[in-house]
Amino acid sequence: MKKTGKTAALALTMSMAVTAMPFGVSAEETDKTVVRINMESEPDNLDPWLSAASDTEAVFHNVFEGLVLFDETGALIPGLAESWDISDDGLTYTFHLRDDVTFHNGKAFSAEDVVYTYESLSGLGGEEALSSKFKNLTSVEAVDDYTVTMTLAEADAAFLQYTRVAVLPKGYEDQSSAPVGTGPFVFEKYVPGQMVVLEKNEDYYDESRMPKIDEAQIYIMGDDSAVLTALQSGQLDAGIVYADSADYLTGDFTVNSSPQNMVQLFALNNSATPFDDVRVRQAFEYAVNKDQIIDGVFAGYATELYSNFSPVMSYFYNDELEDVYTYDVDKAKELMAEAGYEDGFDITITVPSNYQKHIDTAQVIAQQLKQINVNATIEPVEWGQWLEQVYTNADDQTTVVGLTGKLDPNDILGRYVSDYAKNFMKYNNPDYDKLIEEAKTASDEERVELFKECQKMLTDDAAAVWICDPNAIAVTRSDLKGYTFYPVSFIDLSKLYYEE
């Protein structure tokens, strides 16, 4: 297989017929138009303000909406706010809200819900702030029922992107068990270990995004062989799989593939010995053969990375970093010796156990590191434990994981700011922090150059070993149309339909 950088649709029509329960309907309710698809892991939290998992986000984007939304290109479009104004000094944002929106629990959407949302997220409501993104927010006020003004302490060019955050209804306290949003799909149920069910929102305000299906059944199924079996037997209508797995399908399917703006990385804890020595981190850069990982783990369906940026972010992407580190074991050994580690050392790679490709990648890396006398032990841990141990507490030496795509470069590169709570790489460079701050108030042209310099700084410091952007692979029944890729995690159920 060859690498692909653009969406490919390959019809796989084979001779074997598959028979099972009826396609597109549930066994119990044959009068509904149903799509059955999988998600790789359990939802980490049904409350969108508390969730951190990309799989959860991909599904629940259908349930929740922000003041602004995004299209297939990543461009911002009106959401719950039909328009907005930004003051000349960049400090005041005025949002003009839709007046025809109803939450799934029947509550009419209005300015009070926006005020509640942003006071909760920023801590302005008196409680502990739920998101560091809104620490710059000094006030949020309802001008009238459908106009809200937000004021910032300092101008921030990324702020509008942040308003994609889910707006939740004031006074509703059951989000973690029975989530309520305004989106085109309504949460019906979650059966732990089995499935999430979403129903069409019959009262959805936007006719252009009105779902064409009645119900989506999202099965929690991360094992590729199980997904393939379910597709083959007709128990799934669509499946999220890995590239090499799709070749094993027989029957009438379409394989959709596209880069997903994800960064798979071998993250090194920069504050822990021996990774507090930049020479060791640089040695690892030279010792890891990314082509071997891309070909062996992802069957060639991935794009090699050189910093924490995918080429999908073309406007901001620094294409001058591709030759900074090339696979060179001798150079890696030289750097290890300079750092005093000629005889190597032992490390642990802590990997979330529900992501097989990250485990596979860790296994390849472990073999490669033997060439520089590094003995790597792979420690698979459950997703919840990984989130607490690594993502929250940075209590690890190394990890292999995928960082989800973001629409604004500040969201991507802000992960490495020294005081960012989820900087689990523990990267600390005051000059880098300064560049990120400068970018907040810079012009569009200046931001491009600042973010390119940030990428160079991360690469020079070898803050992590960035591996690849794995292609997203979605297999659908040949009559199921409308599957659309986005530069962030999103399974857009509203676009799916069956061709008659």
What are these regions (language model features)?
Residues 38-88, 119, 180:
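N-terminal lobe/hinge region of extracytoplasmic solute-binding protein
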Residues 110-117, 145-149, 183-184, 212-215, ...:
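Alpha-helical secondary-structure segments
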Residues 139-141, 188-197, 217-272:
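Extracellular/periplasmic solute-recognition and catalytic clefts
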Residues 82-127, 274:
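Aromatic- and charge-enriched surface segment that lines or borders ligand/interaction sites
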Residues 85, 89, 129-171, 189-191:
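Surface-exposed binding/hinge segments that line
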Residues 72-75, 158-217, 223-226, 330:
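Gly/Pro-rich hinge or "lid" segments in bacterial periplasmic/extracellular proteins
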Residues 287-315, 357-366, 387-500:
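Detector for C-terminal structural segments
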Residues 303-338, 356-358:
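Structural transition elements
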